[in-house]
């Protein structure tokens, strides 16, 4: 066996690299994961949390395709909630707080358990390319490693530069060296390299926090899961989050120190994540606000550190101390690790195919923050797709990628490769025009059979899913096949119905009524109880009540396509359009798209924003049913 020859080489052991290596190995390809430190595989470099709105949808889809992130999150969860429970099912999403060391250990165990996957502690320094094909990697130790495909998942390590006030130093993250030579290798290949910025807050010693003065936020019971068909064997105990907030004094401290912030002193010119701004940006952009909520998230069950979510900063250490101590409950808090801003290289994702292979260098795949995204979940989703396709193409098979209609992963990738990024890309449900169909509750229905065909879904997961699917389909058929008739209901059934029944209806039709539960319609129909898990019952209720909304959204999407060629008035005032986000207003005002279709293709302009734009045009009398490319004005 040639120990320097592999089917797939993955560079980087973060969330994208973990998914890429695991996916390639699951498909039976000999795989090598190279990372500068084996002890940091799967590290939660920033916040100790997985999921959230849009992001949780990605994790559910990763799991449905056989990926590992959902399973790792469940195994390390110490706090879990379903967000947006008062809103519609399409925007509900799971978010967990993870025990940081447990998550990393679980990631390492998951990789160690895969036959055909080797790990190497080394630094990849040069991509080997000949005739526009990548055939391997040269490392810091001098090793030359060959492969049919190479997946680069370098995170913030490409020419990474940390800023704390006016102090700067090279690093991929605190305590880890930057990958300067790998970045230079990418530039030497003629790839379009640019810079982005992100940041992290200081960590706080929990023992110096007045816990009794702060409200606690507990998780949901029962604890929600990302991976329902691969549940953890021994769930961890819960740890509550604490809630504090910034004060007018906090904001004064920050405003007085803006000249020392790398984002405001000119030291950093690149764009940061709009939806995860630094505390400096919050104070400047929302000058009318006198406070911002701060969640103090536990780093782990045995950890003494708290992560203050909401105060990412690159201010000097002394300023960080002052602003932390100006918040309730933190008056005596001690910082254990300073926050910092970090700049890093990324590549223009418009140079990629939809299966994340370079359009100019065959066999080279890119995934994660190197493509301009932010967040563990976005990185993991890309890593999964890149790893699957590196494995498939190296085996002579056709590449595969999900479409926008199939998955949030498809929305993510299509946005990246079609419109590119000008700031770190974060997933939101509003980015998906088919979001009513792409729900958290039906990820397996949409993708697990696909994952099985691809070879990514294992036997145990498939068996559990198939059992669930069959039970769900059988009960759906039973509800659709059982009719109730006016005048044939007993008094108790009529009482449960809560009103008159004017015509024959199936039980599934009755389930569309929001006031009736699954148990209600089963009782009304005289059906015996079925052996269904709770989530199957919930899914049936959601399906019944959402069918009409899904159809309506599909009609709306078709309407958007019809109006794509409608021209926009040159003097259109986007600030006057109700409901548009600041990001969308700024982008439309700056870019001045000529048509509705051009507006829809701009980064950050969501399908929901296009609907608001069309409503505005119609109200002003500027919109007519298109028969061609006529002017809206």
Curated annotation (Swiss-Prot):
Chief localization: cytoplasm
Residues annotated for FAD binding in this entry: 12-17
InterPro entries referenced in this protein's UniProt entry, alphabetically: FAD/NAD-bd_sf, GIDA_C_N, MnmG, MnmG-rel, MnmG-rel_CS, MnmG_C, MnmG_C_subdom, MnmG_C_subdom_sf
Subcellular locations according to the entry: Cytoplasm
Keywords annotated in UniProt: Cytoplasm, FAD, Flavoprotein, NAD, tRNA processing
Cofactor: FAD
Highest taxon of the lineage: Bacteria
Molecular function terms, GO-annotated: flavin adenine dinucleotide binding
Swiss-Prot/TrEMBL GO biological process terms: tRNA methylation; tRNA wobble uridine modification
Entry-linked SUPFAM superfamilies: FAD/NAD(P)-binding domain (SSF51905)
Pfam families recorded: GIDA, GIDA_C_1st, SAM_GIDA_C
Gene3D superfamilies, alphabetized: FAD/NAD(P)-binding domain (3.50.50.60), GidA associated domain, C-terminal subdomain (1.10.150.570), tRNA uridine 5-carboxymethylaminomethyl modification enzyme MnmG/GidA (1.10.10.1800)
A GO CC term assigned to this protein in UniProt: cytosol
Amino acids binding NAD(+): 272-286
Stated family: Belongs to the MnmG family.
Assembly description: Homodimer. Heterotetramer of two MnmE and two MnmG subunits.
NCBIfam families, sorted: mnmG_gidA
Function: NAD-binding protein involved in the addition of a carboxymethylaminomethyl (cmnm) group at the wobble position (U34) of certain tRNAs, forming tRNA-cmnm(5)s(2)U34.
Annotated protein name in UniProt: tRNA uridine 5-carboxymethylaminomethyl modification enzyme MnmG
